[in-house]
């Protein structure tokens, strides 16, 4: 039996998040159902991250034990894509060591968040970007992210139900103005708390609107209090873009 990993992408619009749950449609659930059809037995998968309801992925990484040693990685990829719904796609399959675990062996996770600042709504993008028809001061936002980069206690930017260690490391945050009034916020780190990226985006938007000075980010971070921060940016603007390991 060999162990394989797969890079997958999915449109999170019609999923109740990644993690398997009874009686609702999840990314993990549809992948494990597809693998069961292929291998005629239940195959359990592990993932590099558990995206929330409505969050998308370009480069989620999963791993599982393949019970058929005769199948090549290309055979596995083709079989999975033939059995998956059209909002999930396997981009690549490759062999990994038998003890590989995507959650623990990944060294960097990269998230992308898209904000559409045009005055007019784009109905075709409504599930894939946060439509926010206001001018944002990107220079001020870039100053604010410097307080977040590095290793800190991110209690102010976590969801209340997350009981894990709040100390996390953000390697880098980039804020880019793209074509057609799109703003990209790219966040790179080893691991993240639940809704941490979306909570950071909401705080950066406060700075971009000039409701907060960039230095306010340091104050919020040091407060270690969720109520000191802003709200939470919508899920549909967030993409689990890529992992490195």
Curated annotation (Swiss-Prot):
This is tRNA pseudouridine synthase A. Its EC number is 5.4.99.12. Formation of pseudouridine at positions 38, 39 and 40 in the anticodon stem and loop of transfer RNAs. Homodimer. Coiled coil: none annotated. Keywords: Isomerase, tRNA processing. CDD domains: PseudoU_synth_EcTruA (cd02570). It catalyses: uridine(38/39/40) in tRNA = pseudouridine(38/39/40) in tRNA. InterPro entries: PsdUridine_synth_cat_dom_sf (IPR020103), PsdUridine_synth_TruA (IPR001406), PsdUridine_synth_TruA_a/b_dom (IPR020097), PsdUridine_synth_TruA_C (IPR020095), TruA/RsuA/RluB/E/F_N (IPR020094). Belongs to the tRNA pseudouridine synthase TruA family. It comes from the Bacteria. GO terms for molecular function: RNA binding; tRNA pseudouridine(38-40) synthase activity. PANTHER family: PSEUDOURIDYLATE SYNTHASE (PTHR11142), TRNA PSEUDOURIDINE SYNTHASE-LIKE 1 (PTHR11142:SF0). The gene is truA. Pfam families: PseudoU_synth_1 (PF01416).
């Amino acid at each position: 039996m060999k162990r394989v990993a797969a890079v997958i992408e999915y449109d999170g619009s019609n999923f109740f998040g990644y993690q398997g749950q009874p009686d609702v449609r999840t990314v993990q659930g549809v992948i494990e159902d597809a693998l069961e059809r292929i291998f005629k037995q239940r195959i359990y998968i592990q993932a590099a991250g558990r995206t929330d309801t409505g969050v998308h992925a370009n480069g989620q990484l999963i791993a599982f034990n393949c019970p058929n040693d005769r199948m090549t990685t290309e055979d596995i990829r083709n079989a999975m894509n033939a059995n998956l719904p059209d909002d999930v796609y396997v981009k690549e399959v490759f062999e990994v060591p038998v003890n590989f675990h995507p959650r623990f062996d990944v060294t960097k996770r990269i998230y992308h968040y898209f904000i559409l600042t045009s005055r007019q709504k784009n109905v075709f993008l409504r599930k894939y970007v946060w439509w926010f028809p206001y001018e944002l001061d990107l220079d001020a936002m870039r100053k604010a992210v410097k307080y977040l980069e590095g290793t800190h206690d991110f209690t102010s930017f976590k969801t209340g139900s997350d009981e894990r260690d709040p100390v996390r490391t953000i390697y880098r945050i980039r804020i880019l103005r793209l074509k057609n009034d799109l703003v990209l916020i790219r966040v790179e780190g080893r691991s993240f708390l639940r809704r941490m990226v979306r909570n950071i985006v909401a705080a950066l938007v406060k700075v971009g609107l000039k409701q907060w000075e960039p230095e306010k980010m340091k104050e919020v971070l040091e407060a270690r209090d969720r109520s000191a921060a802003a709200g939470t940016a919508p899920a549909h603007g967030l993409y689990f873009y890529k992992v490195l390991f």
